[in-house]
């Protein structure tokens, strides 16, 4: 990764003069003034950071206001910056990934350093990803597919909500929710856009769906096991183009040889995406977490090959595996970027839903390509967008404060930014 550095030295006495001239409001946001508690040395440090950031941009303070660079402190007192407006646009135009800042105080002087870390160039795997498409101006709701989501046991309506919201934010045309009766009133209020269906009535209703998503907060009782087995064995569900298995659907497969065999037979013909985190994958592989950690890439590639599935092995640096056709090279993507704000309950449900919506979007644009290729492409895009969207959320909400319900909005923003960048290439 490339970096650029900006350094600024400021006499604290100069800040006192600026305060006397009444210029503080033109330089510092209300939150910066509140956090400073009137301390001139603190304001001087923040001012110096703003100047250092502008120097790291290579522009100086031109084309944006100092108010658009906000200097705050975390719970431990470490400074960090938030960017707004034109300052944010400059950062994005430089393909910035993060800004690290530090401040030193001698009593008479403050010295600030800003390090702008730039994103690495797209690697070979990313370079062959299909461009994320703009929405077809001649489209209608049927153009962008139908996602059927089986999620949410009693008391887990949130999992169904997060998944449905993720699917809609990614661009799915219609989302159908199959959940417990006890969840329906809450879900009708939380996401009235979703169509509520009876969990017991899944016959021909499934045949016209683009994506089936099973598992978020679903539970592992015998009824759910039978539903999953029925989907894997009956022809109606195979009319759906894509099957995404998450959370409890994966746990059910890990506990049943019958389900695992049915999965393998199903995936021989139809595209399947699995989305386990490390603990869930250790159950699928019947290995310890330590063994998985030591041989993650090897085990992931083996499982994807033997089960004929696209495997998204979620971690702080997520890996995506897909069976490789003979002579076509290896289908593997490793996203080395991470976002710790995603380590919260519900983020996996959002991701599974967003992935399902992305499948609909790529199917609409690239429907003439092999479905298993679209499944791999969608998986890679979803992994990238998840991290980029998480970072957008951190900028506005703070690293500790991000909630799952907020993620679909930021994932969608990251997706739109990727679309715009593709158009500029």
Predicted features and spans:
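Glycine-rich phosphate/dinucleotide-binding loop and adjoining beta-alpha-beta core of small-molecule
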Residues: 176-337, 416-425
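Charged C-terminal helix
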Residues: 387-425
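Core catalytic alpha/beta fold that binds nucleotide/phospho-ligands
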Residues: 1-123
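Substrate-binding N-lobe of the ribokinase-like
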Residues: 140-198
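Short glycine/threonine-rich catalytic loop with a Thr-x-Gly-x-Asp
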Residues: 136-144, 154-160, 338-355, 375, ...
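Short, well-structured alpha-helical segments that form the helix of a local strand-helix-strand
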Residues: 296-305, 367-390, 404-412
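Short, small-residue alpha-helix embedded
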Residues: 283, 344-369, 374-382
